[in-house]
């Protein structure tokens, strides 16, 4: 059974440990995150935030116990990613792609993508279907990423430095949109930031 029940944690880590050569990034780390929470991992460079995210997403090997939405990200990553969305701090869209093509692509690869919902989000921005990424400001690119992600019915949204490089007004708009249009008691948001 893969459904996350309201009394079960979305993420549960016990003794999470990861070393890179001689550098210990995570040292016997324990944490638990329940459904319907917004959690921020805040700290300086080298604190282990990105390493923890990579473990949660099943992108790196690690020691210890880690369960995400009732699954082991090391062995059940493909299944897990049906219920997880991720925006990386270095998330890049091809500069040649148009808004409509980005929507088409995500619709083709993610079974829980709602095209109509994405188009509604985009209608509230300055983005136009024929606009190419190379014609967009950084803030507009973030709006496109956000529209694509918010249109996926995911239980866990993982954001790594999602507002990096944005001015204070765009940051505020980003988080307001996320809270008002996406977040609810069934969804969990995990954010890392230095800010």
Report residues per predicted region:
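Short coil-to-beta microelement around the adenine-binding A-loop and adjacent beta1/P-loop entry
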Residues: 23-24, 78
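Conserved ABC transporter NBD signature motif
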Residues: 58, 62-75, 79-80
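Catalytic Walker B motif of ABC-type/P-loop ATPase nucleotide-binding domains
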Residues: 157-161, 166
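The feature captures the beta-strand-to-loop junction immediately N-terminal to the Walker
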Residues: 39-44
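Helical segment within the ABC ATPase nucleotide-binding domain
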Residues: 172-185
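ABC-family P-loop ATPase nucleotide-binding domains
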Residues: 88-145
